[in-house]
Amino acid sequence: MLAIAGPRQRGGAFCDGVSRRDVLRVGTLAALGTTGGWSLPTLLKAEAATGGPRPKSVIMIYLVGGPPHQDMFDLKPDAPREIAGPWRPIATNVPGFQICEAFPRLAGCADKLTVIRSIIGNQADHDAVQVFNGRDPRRPKPSGGWPQFGTVVSRLEGAARLESPPFVSLCYQCTHGPYNEPGPGFLGMAHSPLRPLGDSRRDLVLNGVTLDRLADRMTLMRSLDTLRRDIDTTGMMAGYDASTEQAMGLLTSSRVADALDLSREDPRIVERYGTGDPKVMIDSNGAPRVPQSLLVARRLVEAGVRVVTLNYSKWDWHGGVNVEGRANNSIFVREAEEFPIFDRCVSALVEDLHERGLADDCAVVVWGEFGRTPKISPIVGRDHWPQVNCALMFGGTMRHGQVIGATDRIAGEAVARPVTFGEVYATLFHHLGIDVQRTTVDDLHGRPQHLVEGQAKPIAELVG
């Protein structure tokens, strides 16, 4: 949620004597319907003073359930049939860089992509925690739990623009609990993401309520909260206050609401990404297959959001009969359905970011919680495989057009340049200008905690 002031405020006063801290304070007052003696021209001048380079941002796309790395980005055509499967690799526009034949659009923009084929340290069970915060859920955690990446960014950086939250989640709630993103951990509710999906989107517009009425309601709420604040020792009230201020800011601004409204987008761009039904949860317990979420994510970072997370479809293809009683549930049938849509929407995001001049400012990572077994099962599926995983990255002034790492002849083990989840997140923090070697956040007991696990450093092949 919106964190107006934090320990990492940068810079001092602007040339007109208005400090950045004052600018942020003014934004809060404006969102609450009170200006503290500041005139409207001064408010507008103060907001204009925050202009400059577009804020850096990250989009994190979670492929729910664990995608099959050896059928997507690490094909082994010379392996036995029971390992290689039916897919064949195709050349990309980068010499020596091959991917699945079902991804012709991605092949055409591979010079803008990086595939990491050697992610290690995965767990064997479904748990989205590691995807969202880079932490091994099997290891001890501090009181309150580890915060996810966007929560940490919210705490350290706050909002990039006065009326935009630092962190938005476009993740759909899955009925299978382990597929869902974790909470804010020990950083608390004040830094939880804005979750605009479903009925809550109606809260992003005024619906006829005037700013004066909003200000009156806010005054009453703050008066009633005084007593509760005096006796509250859990920190939840601070989170509530921050959430309320966030909501007030959004209610008085259309920027985020407009970003979520695809009717305002060029229909040709919407068509390029494709659309899906958000009410259809894949296999009943996964996320919906909604390519338009990637477009909404682009619109949100363009509106000033620092971190956008989203979950996409379901990739846990064990074969056999699925939870909906679907008999023809072969992994290769599912891939034939899923891969073309994935190719279309991800390549659309790649090209869209470049065409709109956002590619250097927005880094994207696409991954799941683990890989899949090299050997195809008797019921024509691939099971969980924690030994190795893969990720697709693009954007963010990184050196793309490359493959990092390698696996053995059956895509079962990393044999070159193993990469950890922590290294990927160190790279994303680096993109945002946050030094993971020097920066910490305090837990509930006041102990400084490092941002990534195992003293991981940014991936040198990308940023070094």
Please describe what each predicted stretch is.
Residues 1-464:
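Ligand-binding pockets and gating/stacking loops
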